[in-house]
């Protein structure tokens, strides 16, 4: 194996191991994985905000909500992929 490949494998191993070492067992209780959505929600609730309107339809469960989100992401990815492929093919035909 060439030296270049060994260096690349070492870098990949470091990239994989480093987050596991830094994590050090801190969990959600300590707020390690708290996101900006959670922090924003807490601030809004502290202010006593009342929503102006309610959603027309709410998914019956979190799984269905996740399914709808995944479908939306998949449809968007298909549309973006189609246009990228279309313009690449158009450019190749023109060349």
UniProtKB/Swiss-Prot annotation:
<protein>
    <recommendedName>
        <fullName>Cobalt transport protein CbiN</fullName>
    </recommendedName>
</protein>
<keyword id="KW-0171">Cobalt transport</keyword>
<keyword id="KW-0170">Cobalt</keyword>
<comment type="similarity">
    <text>Belongs to the CbiN family.</text>
</comment>
<keyword id="KW-0813">Transport</keyword>
<keyword id="KW-0169">Cobalamin biosynthesis</keyword>
<dbReference type="InterPro" id="IPR003705">
    <property type="entry name" value="CbiN"/>
</dbReference>
<dbReference type="Pfam" id="PF02553">
    <property type="entry name" value="CbiN"/>
</dbReference>
<comment type="function">
    <text>Part of the energy-coupling factor (ECF) transporter complex CbiMNOQ involved in cobalt import.</text>
</comment>
<keyword id="KW-1133">Transmembrane helix</keyword>
<dbReference type="GO" id="GO:0009236">
    <property type="term" value="P:cobalamin biosynthetic process"/>
</dbReference>
<keyword id="KW-0472">Membrane</keyword>
<feature type="transmembrane region" description="Helical">
    <location>
        <begin position="67"/>
        <end position="87"/>
    </location>
</feature>
<dbReference type="GO" id="GO:0015087">
    <property type="term" value="F:cobalt ion transmembrane transporter activity"/>
</dbReference>
<feature type="transmembrane region" description="Helical">
    <location>
        <begin position="5"/>
        <end position="25"/>
    </location>
</feature>
<keyword id="KW-1003">Cell membrane</keyword>
<comment type="subunit">
    <text>Forms an energy-coupling factor (ECF) transporter complex composed of an ATP-binding protein (A component, CbiO), a transmembrane protein (T component, CbiQ) and 2 possible substrate-capture proteins (S components, CbiM and CbiN) of unknown stoichimetry.</text>
</comment>
<keyword id="KW-0406">Ion transport</keyword>
<comment type="pathway">
    <text>Cofactor biosynthesis; adenosylcobalamin biosynthesis.</text>
</comment>
<keyword id="KW-0812">Transmembrane</keyword>
<dbReference type="GO" id="GO:0005886">
    <property type="term" value="C:plasma membrane"/>
</dbReference>
